[in-house]
């Protein structure tokens, strides 16, 4: 009976994978009542606001409070909006039995498996308190990704203003529910998901009465393959849910982040390191301070760069109109009473005469005065 039970579970998984796309297309999406702008600390996230930049310190502190403080200092210098770490209980993220998930890093000359690495880089109570206190003194928003419910309780004691849930927990509805019940905003990463999975997470979140949700489009591969980034999904999620959407970027450079800002991403999360050459699982795909500074500079100007969407003549263009835009000119000297023809008029710059779109209206009309060659033809001269 146990064998049959497990075989039935396998069959469900096979059918789920086989028909995932069909489920993705057919699943009814309930009209939501989530906020289309969300306040993170003292910043508002949404359309018509500057893109919010999160420096994801993650595990890049390498277990050192000193390095963590340096990451905070550099994030402040880069003018990032927030810095994020990761919080989890010992032996809680992955099974200790996993033998084939080694990272290409060494500790004291020994290869570590994933669980051992997480345990080594886990933030204890003292570590948490010191970096949270330090960041707040430096006037930068600090928060964390909880990977289990106990960590949510702990972060509540540290009075975080909002939460991030990682892509691996997008299917962890109990954790989503736990964060939702805090009443604080949630940033949810959506790597390894489709609309069906995202919809399940959102509906669970909404049951708590919390209306402050931000989605991050994400490609959960490390480093990310640019051909699989599918950045258009950012606007797909925006159009479906009418909430802020951004990008959790695992691409080695900032090019993908810049492109996502260009198509309207409201928030960018990028891994942050002091040195890409440090040993550790995420350093190589992280941004160093100089690169992060460039991203922040672009993001801060993104609102004015993207503009209103209205196609208008900008103030700086009027001078160019006067000096370069074309109008109708006399090709040769034209006598008073002479008819305008294609032989005696032409189109050239600068502006000052009749616009070329009216040329058919003036052909055959007579000049009301003499016009010298290479002078503009105006309505008063007809």
Annotate each PLM feature:
Residues 3-382:
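Catalytic cores and adjacent flexible loops of soluble metabolic enzymes
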């Amino acid at each position: 009976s146990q064998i049959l039970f497990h075989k039935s579970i396998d069959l469900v998984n096979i059918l789920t994978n086989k028909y995932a796309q069909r489920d993705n297309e057919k699943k009814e999406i309930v009209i939501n009542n989530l906020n289309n702008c969300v306040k993170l600390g003292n910043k508002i996230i949404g359309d018509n606001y500057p893109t919010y930049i999160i420096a994801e310190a993650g595990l890049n502190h390498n277990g050192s409070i000193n390095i963590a403080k340096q990451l905070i200092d550099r994030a402040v210098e880069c003018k990032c909006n927030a810095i994020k770490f990761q919080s989890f209980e010992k032996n809680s993220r992955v099974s200790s039995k996993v033998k084939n998930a080694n990272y290409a890093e060494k500790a004291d000359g020994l290869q570590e498996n994933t669980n051992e690495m997480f345990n080594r880089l886990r933030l204890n109570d003292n570590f948490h308190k010191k970096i949270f206190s330090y960041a707040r003194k430096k006037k930068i928003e600090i928060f964390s990704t909880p990977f289990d419910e106990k960590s949510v309780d702990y972060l509540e004691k540290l009075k975080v203003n909002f939460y991030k849930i990682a892509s691996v927990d997008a299917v962890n509805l109990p954790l989503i529910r736990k964060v939702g019940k805090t009443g604080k905003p949630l940033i949810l990463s959506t790597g390894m998901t489709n609309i069906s999975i995202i919809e399940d997470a959102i509906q669970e979140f909404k049951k708590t009465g919390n209306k402050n949700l931000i989605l991050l489009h994400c490609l959960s591969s490390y480093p990310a393959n640019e051909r699989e980034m599918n950045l258009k999904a950012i606007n797909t999620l925006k159009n479906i849910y009418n909430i802020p959407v951004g990008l959790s970027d695992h691409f080695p450079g900032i090019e993908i982040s810049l492109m996502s800002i260009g198509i309207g991403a409201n928030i960018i999360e990028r891994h942050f390191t002091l040195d890409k050459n440090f040993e550790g699982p995420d350093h190589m795909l992280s941004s160093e301070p100089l690169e992060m500074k460039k991203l922040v500079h672009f993001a801060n100007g993104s609102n004015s760069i993207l503009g209103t969407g209205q196609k208008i003549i900008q103030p700086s263009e009027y001078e160019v109109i006067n000096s370069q835009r074309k109008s109708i000119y006399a090709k040769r000297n034209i006598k008073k009473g002479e008819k305008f023809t294609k032989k005696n008029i032409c189109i050239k710059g600068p502006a000052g005469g009749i616009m070329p779109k009216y040329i058919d209206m003036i052909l055959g009309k007579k000049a009301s005065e003499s016009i010298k060659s290479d002078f503009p033809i105006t309505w008063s001269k007809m």
